[in-house]
Amino acid sequence: MKKGAVGIGTLIVFIAMVLVAAVAAAVLINTSGYLQQKSQATGRQTTQEVASGIKVTRVVGKADSATNPTYIQELAVYITPNAGSSGIDLTKVRITLSDGQKQAIFKYRVGNSANELYFLAELMQNLGATIKFDNGSVQVYFDPTDWTSAAPTVIIDTTNKVIEIVNATVDSNDNHIKPATDSNVTISFDTPVSLYAFANPVSDVFDNDAFNNLTTKTDFGIAVLQDSDGSLDNKEYPTLTKGDLVVLALRVGGTQSLGYSSGVSKISVISTTTTDVLTKQSSVNVTITWTAVFGNGFDTGTKVTGKVIPEFGAPGIIEFTTPSTYTQQVIELQ
């Protein structure tokens, strides 16, 4: 009996050991499978990070005058993807630029931010530009110098397509939108338009919508020079792929004035009553005027550094020193 009990006990221990080994083996198999998948994913990500990226092939500047050039005010940054790079979403690209005194970060305006409900509200809230609304007989102005104490609170109503400027009025003397305590100003739209700083195809690198449609001082535009597979056809989602060549358009100095036919239908002052100051006739034209981040632009002998930074992968490098004299308007800088 004792020997039988010992045998049964040994068998139980043996079975338990087999079960433990089986469980351990299952855990090891699952763990190894998980680690293998993780390592593969990490490898793909690492390969993507190493192989992908942007190469800056050249930088060309345009000065303020053909006869007496003094400041570089526009930059055309030529980029192409690195060899072996996967597609690069240009809406996620950021450009950093510094002249040693200031540093600016530029982005491509796309989607809702390209809609005038959003960029007009942004410009007013940030005091970023002078804005003129003109229906052909009446002009209404938003001027940042009228808001010296504080920037206005601006509310966007996308459902009713209205921008509301809180605690504001339209001065009857000069038709400027100014601070007030007992009224709001509403800017109503039929169909808000969208503006894209995008050009495809391009005949003149510096005279196209990539430069002309820049709506704020921290925008960059996209001018397509070469696109064999159509990956850059969609201005909402331009993607840089193998063989593509693109110019990123930046205004770095001087004043930009952008005029366009707007979707604005009326501008009203709302207090105890509603007064329509401007109503749409055939159309309402809007003119946006702003000064670039670097003031007049880059003077002679200025060292400029920066990067073109994709969402993943290696950034393209911008580094040049402007010439000691400007002898022509368009100048190769890098």
UniProtKB/Swiss-Prot annotation:
Functional summary from the UniProt entry: Flagellin is the subunit protein which polymerizes to form the filaments of archaeal flagella.
GO BP terms, alphabetized: archaeal or bacterial-type flagellum-dependent cell motility
Keywords: Archaeal flagellum
Molecular function per GO: structural molecule activity
Keyword tRNA processing in record: no
Protein name as it appears in the record: Probable flagellin PH0549
First-listed, main subcellular location of the protein, grouped into a coarse class: other
GO cellular component term of the entry, any: archaeal-type flagellum
Species this chain originates from: Pyrococcus horikoshii (strain ATCC 700860 / DSM 12428 / JCM 9974 / NBRC 100139 / OT-3)
Subcellular location: Archaeal flagellum
Origin: domain of life: Archaea
Family as reported in the entry's similarity comment: Belongs to the archaeal flagellin family.
A matching Pfam family: Arch_flagellin
